[in-house]
């Protein structure tokens, strides 16, 4: 930035970092600076649309998305980037919808297919999620995220599944025998407590996976092992 303060990729990275830290006003300020340099930068408009969605400003989000698609109406990058940012804010259903739109624009857009696979797995739509992960891996066997996910999928096949009280609890056979029933009882108690506290009902089975190693949890959550700190 000291060499070229108008470098858009560097500015956009700063905007993303500020958004990740929930410094939305600062992120918006950086985006305004970008639009003064390049008012048609699609990826920046995608981030702008995502930030408006996070702040519950649907009309502004729609307008920002339209600006990102102004000169390429079917650019899959725009919806992919919007959805990716929304998913990073735990808005997985909204993020998945944008990935589906990106794939409608370009059915072979692997970034969207990989992200959609992860979103669906987080939403409990496992059959489609694992299928998309396999499709993405077949298209790019060197992609780290899908390789890690499918390796974990093979491990999960060896787990014991306890299906009771609206929960699907997956854990290793040894741990399931040791405290599986107690875990289901605790989950049931927690659901009743928080359903009453927040006056809501959880629809569909809740999938809970207990991993013996932290790296497996990291792969399931982030697509890559790690997570120290």
What are the functions of these language-model segments?
Residues 118-144, 151:
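TPR/TPR-like (Sel1-like) alpha-helical repeat modules
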């Amino acid at each position: 930035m000291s060499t070229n303060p108008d470098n858009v990729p560097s500015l956009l990275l700063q905007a993303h970092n500020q958004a990740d830290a929930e410094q939305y006003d600062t992120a918006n300020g950086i985006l305004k600076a970008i639009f003064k340099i390049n008012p048609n930068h699609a990826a920046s408009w995608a981030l702008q649309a995502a930030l408006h969605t996070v702040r519950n400003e649907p009309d502004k989000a729609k307008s920002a998305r339209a600006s990102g698609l102004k000169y390429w109406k079917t650019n899959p990058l725009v919806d992919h980037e919007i959805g990716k940012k929304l998913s990073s804010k735990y808005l997985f259903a909204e993020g998945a919808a944008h990935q589906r739109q990106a794939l409608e624009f370009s059915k072979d857009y692997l970034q969207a297919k990989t992200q959609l696979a992860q979103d669906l797995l987080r939403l409990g739509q496992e059959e489609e999620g694992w299928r998309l992960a396999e499709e993405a891996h077949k298209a790019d066997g060197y992609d780290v995220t899908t390789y890690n996910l499918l390796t974990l999928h093979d491990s999960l096949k060896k787990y014991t599944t306890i299906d009771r009280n609206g929960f699907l609890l997956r854990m290793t056979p040894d741990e399931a025998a040791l405290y599986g029933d107690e875990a289901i009882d605790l989950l049931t108690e927690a659901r009743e407590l928080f359903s009453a506290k927040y006056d809501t009902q959880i629809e569909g089975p809740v999938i809970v996976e207990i991993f013996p190693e932290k790296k497996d949890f990291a792969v399931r959550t982030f697509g890559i092992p790690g997570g120290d700190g």
